[in-house]
Amino acid sequence: MDAPDLHLLLHPRHKEVHDFYAGYEAEIRPHLCDGCNTCAAMCRFDAVEYGTPKPRINPLKCEGCKVCVEFCPTDAISFTPRHCGTWYISHTRMGPMAHAQLFPAQENSGRLVALLRQHAKKLAREQGIRLILSDGPPGIGCPVISALSGVHLAVVVTEPTPSGMHDLARVMDLCGHFQIPVAVIINKCDLSPRIAGEIETQCIQDGHAVVARLPHDSDFVHALVQGRAITEFSSGETVRQIKIAWERIVALVNLPHPGDKARAMGAETLEDPVTEENH
């Protein structure tokens, strides 16, 4: 996700820390620059600022297009891999966790998602874990496609609002393109019972399971403030519905038998199977 918060609940203890690089960034080498400002004139992202006596590149605006590098008459601009953030392998009270933190103004990418999923699968094999939960970002862009690739089930959380219905339809279309089964959770279902009913009806017509209708519950906020999951904080009706939803999700995933190399539920199984679910 672009602004993940799972670490606030799980308090991960880092076992491995790695730098993450994606794309490239330009940087002017002052000792080679003659101050002609050709780079500033050519940049269409206004990343190069006219300088006195020499220009400078604003790294927050640079898109890494390399046009300044190509047109610099004195070869004064370096083009190096962009250090975008840090990724971690951590231990939590609920199991291993592969996650990352990007620097300000750095965008999530399919490459980062794929990297984390790759290491999550490695951890699962090493520790005999049969199920991986991948937290997917909103929308239908590259990070979402990377998060959905090869999963056995997509769990989509929506809300009964016009924008929620619209975004849900887009994600379900994307899952349909990749032949990924979908399970839907309607969050804050009491926000608009009418729209919640329309969502459920549409899901049934499209063959998607609605595994839970969760009411608005302030216990989510109270649990988050204490750094705990709601299932650790409360035992009310919402928690009961969440546990029922989890049982339904596990049943839908239908874990493959060890050694079965066949494709299961539209996703590729592994020789030592690790079922992956996108949430």
Map each language-model feature to its residues.
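C-terminal lobe/tail of nucleotide-utilizing enzymes
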Residues: 174-279
